Amino acid sequence: MIVGSGIDIVEISRFKKASKRWGENFLNKIFTKNEINYSKKRRFQEQHLAARFAAKEAVLKAFGNKLDHIHNWQDIEILNDKSGKPYIEFHKSAKRLKIKEKISKVVLSMAHCRDHAVANAILVRRK
């Protein structure tokens, strides 16, 4: 049963400005080492990071009014399987919320281009 849906869009130019202004502190506060390393291997690093940021925001929105239960951006980690399909690893506070809400699956979709990154997350609860 679908219990939550969230979507987010990020302007790449605004993301680049924030990244340049706040530097490594910004990236390390939002992203895990795995997410940063993945994006560094890509041609358009900022687009990949912005898509991951949008995905994290989409997941938070899908949880709705329970946002205060997730204490750290890094508790929601966006990874890719061998085929390149994105998936989410929940850690610490996000994992506790996932268990509490009986979320069995998160369907995640991300896309990016030169100007924007977008993500959609759908939370599915086991019966």
Cite the ranges covered by each PLM segment.
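Core catalytic alpha/beta fold that binds nucleotide/phospho-ligands
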Residues: M1-K127
